[in-house]
Amino acid sequence: TQTREESFDFLMNQRFIHMKLGFTKEGLITAIDDFSIADGGVQGSSGFGTANDQGYGPYYTTKCLNIRQRMEIIDSNTGKMYLSGQFCPFNWDTLTVGLHIIAEKLNKDVIDIAKLNLHGPDSQEDDRVVPSFEACIEAGKKLMNWNWHKAGTKTLPDGRKHGASFRYQICPRHAFSGYDCKLEYRGGQIHLPTQGPITGIFAIECNAMVIAEELNVEYDDVIVDYHWSHKFTPVGGGSDGTTASGWAMKECANILKKNILEQAAYEAENPPAGGMFGGPPQANPLKGYKADELDIAPHPLAEPKEAPAPGPFAAPPVTGPVVYVKSDPSIFKSLASAVSLELVATFSGRPPAALWSLGMGKMLDTMNTCYCEVAVDEEIGAVEILRLGVVADPGKVIRLTSMESQVDQVMFFTQGCQLFEEFIFDDKTGLRLNNNMIEYKKPTVLDVPTVEKDFRETRSGNAVYGASGLSHSLANTHLVICAIYNATGVWVQPPATPDKVLKALGKI
């Protein structure tokens, strides 16, 4: 067992980027030249965050077709990276910085520069607006009371400099995960057999919510059965964990619902024989109705048309899920008594391919935006984040607490890498000196401001209920740095510690 001081996850190695942009006097980007030198760790590391950047990055979300990207990778022998990239996600904030530079040079709002350059839903030649992006911008400006100003021109009452910044991203769904779903009906309840999460993506409850929604029963009527031998697990790359597995589970739930209603219609015409001590079979109010004339409800929707006959074998009042006649909800029977047999439904598959995986930025559906306000004390170099705001459109929010936690997590990353986290190297040997979690400074819960959130639901995605999810797409490397630039007019290499701020200001 390692102590906190002995343990260290190097996570992401260093990367140096030199980007050149050409743009018109209106701010439209006409040329992009990106050269990177990246540390791959050791030979055999994943190219997820290095070579993959050449196919997916922020540049393809713009109307610019004149793009050149080059990368050299060195191996510093720091460790093997099985999946993590250099930036999270990728090199997105090169464009974020570029948009702020253009806005400052032209004395224009950075949001207006972003809107001018963003292409439409279908291609880089598409001049239409992206509805999801427009919805996020409208709500974001209102949330933050957005009022852009030129760098270094706004001073707060306490004498500190005010700065603000903006960033957009795609809400990605990775679309490389397939699922083998199974549902069982037993005694009026729905059972979901699963081995549970295996990579920290705890989407089981989200799947249960989808099942309850599709079958129109209460969440408590869906029983999750955990066992290592069950095949289904709702994992997947990034946001696939919930949205893609939810799509597959939705298909499975509808198969089970069809089976339940068909069995209810069959048993109404062919009632099970009464037991020796159970009395004669009760009259079935669903008799004479076909499966497509029936539906399921979480509870009776009306008083029964005919009161149950009195006597020792009279059925108790129905309180749980029921099968009812769609044309007359007063005709119903409890789900448990309407279907006596055990039923099983299975589905194997995945949702349609996501735009993220098909176009890598060249097609757009669901998007997100984030905003930052800072106060910079130019006398001592201290930076305070005044506000962090996120307006995201995941298509459809499946479970609000999960979405909120996803946002809080990535904004924690955001603040940490831009204000606290720093590698310290020995000048003579090049060795990293702070290889532990005490000397590598991460923010604590006392350091991170409350993130103001507003979620849009345009249903623009193509996973369950039009969702795409969020993944780590809001994690960024330069949102705070851009706000510091807007406050002071100087660029600070992250992390923006007081000494670095003062050095950038020319005071030390």
Ranges and model annotations:
Residues 1-135, 142, 150-508:
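Cofactor-binding beta-sheet edge motifs in enzyme active sites
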